[in-house]
Amino acid sequence: MMKTYIGIDPGKSGALAVIEENGDIHVWPFNSVKYAEVLTHLASVRDEIKCCVEKVGAMPGQGVVSMFNFGHNFGFIEGLLLGNWIPYQLVPPQTWKKEFCVTSDKNTSIEVCRKLFPHVSLLPTERSRKPSDGMAEAILIAEYARRRF
């Protein structure tokens, strides 16, 4: 029985990360079709899945459209998890960030992720030059799930 740990940053520039028991790490920037493929596949082939989704609330200054889009993404992700019978826990950002000494500065997520997992690319596409903080955070959330559950 192989354990699989999933971390999801549900934001607009978020990502889905998978850490397998053997240490393999996979990460995808937000893409609804890819998320559906990955979660449906994992649910069909894995016996034990531990999933953590970042629990994010409204932030001061965010507009109505921005919050609607965030809620839409979150609902989509929650629907995929529930539809595939994947149990999950909502984890506040402060909780998982404390585990890794990550601050609110998105660059610290990238730095910590690179130290823990130097072999994992944080570039969302082959043409990207800037690492994705959403991908880094999804990996750290998956690692939080691995350590805690």
Regions found by a protein language model. Give the residues of each.
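Phosphate- and other anionic-substrate recognition elements at nucleic-acid/protein interfaces
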Residues: 1-149
